[in-house]
Amino acid sequence: RRQRQMCIRDSHTNMFSATWPPAVRGLAETFMRLPVRVTVGSDVLSANRRVSQTVEVLDDGRMKERRLNSFLRSIDAQKTNEKILIFALYKKEAQRVENTLRRWGYRVSGIHGDLSQHDRIANLEAFRSASTPLLVATDVAARGLDIPNVEYVINYTFPLTIEDYIHRIGRTGRGGKSGKALTFFTDEDKAHAGELIRVLKDAEQPVPKEMDRFPTTIKRKTHSSYGDHYKELVPGKAKKITFDDDD
């Protein structure tokens, strides 16, 4: 707001965002008169096709720890400096997974809301430099962080929305490179089965046969770009101009 107050009243303002969450959009609207919204591509959020997605359906959530250990051993994670970003759902879970990995002998750090800003920055820089090639994070790291050369994203616990899933796996396969994402899916996540299957099919990724046991109904959203809790914050909608990717 302070920066905006420094601009002359009749200035022409362009605002850009990779995503357009309601809070940011509402703030932007307070600065604008008769705005025009320009969308490049589709409003439907889709997964990066350069990311190879693997979904493991587990009968019991308690199997996650064993499967994580098995996967890290299979890629020889202790002997390489490949960056592996592991997502947990809650702060306490993230800390527990981090402690477990450290006990197994891995160089690991974490990012979540219980850490100070200083510690979060230090842990992020250690991950960037691969001095600690494993990072356990909550969804605080799912958006906005551009960390180069992340080889794997592991969804230890499925997120609360399919949008968060797409943003999580988007931390790999950046800058034109390919990436890999592994997701543990349990009965507790069955409400997301239909949306996850859609994302996998749209990206031409394999759908595990075990997903057949889950309901595939996709609940209607109020807005495809902004997720389940989108709410129009201003009474007048802007004009919308949409360009296809080929334009």
Regions found by a protein language model. Give the residues of each.
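Conserved helicase RecA-like core
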Residues: 1-5, 9-223, 240-247
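Intrinsically disordered, low-complexity, serine/threonine- and charge-rich segments
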Residues: 229, 235-238
